Amino acid sequence: MYPAGVSEQSNSEKLVAVTGAAGHIGSNLVRSLLAQGRRVRALVREHTAGIDGLPVEVVRCDVTDAQACRRALAGAPIVYHLAARISVGWDPPGPVEAVNLGGTRNVVEACLACGVQRLVHFSSIHAFSADPVDGVIDESRPLAQNQPHTLIYDRTKAEGERQVMAAVARGLDAVIVNPSSVIGPNDFAPSAMGEALIEIYRGRFPALVGGAGFDWVDVRDVVASALQAETRGRKGAHYLLTGHWLSFVELAQLWGKVSGAKIPRLVAPMWLARAGAPFVAGWSRLRGKRPLFTSDSLRVLRNHRHISHACASAELGHNPRPLEETLRHTYQWFKQAGKLT
């Protein structure tokens, strides 16, 4: 909820700062904020393709720079923190920790120093402990711990949440949202998932991986619920913004249905994919490309089958659309943007 004395109407007239504004979720969020008639300060580190041409105030800000964060957030009562280093086995730990830990710490401290009225912190489903694998994941599940088997992305997102909650105890009004794997339009970079769909469309996936799946959610549904979290979310609360679980094979088949892509018939068992992951990673490095899958990403695709977004549905009205609609709109956007050639 908004702090006492701050109405939704008055808040809608105030400046909103968005870190990671040019990313996949960020560019969709910025568009939705503008559609509400709000003033947006878009914080970006380098690339601006996701927000080029939009009527926003663009500010260059590396979130690993504490002073830059304070300057960039000054005068913005509402902050959405999306800047993150998403990595499932393709980046060394240092850069991931610098952004997801150091960057979040800097943003939180800047929010406290600048008197921000509400922070909406974007975490991830990965922030929650993967064990037990077959258990239902909801907001009551413990955060991932710093254990030898914990993936660096999971650990840093969990620790980022702890930093936000520590700031809440110090007086910061913040709410946390935890999306699952996001798919949808305005995927300029593209994202890892968007790149996988493009590669499948181009026929560069020799085989699909059996025994793998995840929870997939439309980026626009994530944004809509995050906007609701700003105005309706409880201070210090977490909200799982998830969609529908589908195996990777089922997702690829649905992608083929909406795009006309020829989907590989060969389905490799998980053990074979895991054995080949190091070779895929090495070949990708030689080509200067991000690997389509890694040992870590395959491990992720065996977890998180049972996820509940009941809390977000009840409190924020979260209502994920069918994946076929998401994939159809994603295909249409990729085609219009010239990313399928």
What do these predicted regions represent?
Residues 14-36:
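N-terminal Rossmann NAD(P)H-binding glycine-rich loop of SDR-like oxidoreductase domains
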Residues 225-292, 309, 314, 322-341:
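Mid/C-terminal beta-alpha module of Rossmann-like enzyme folds, strongest
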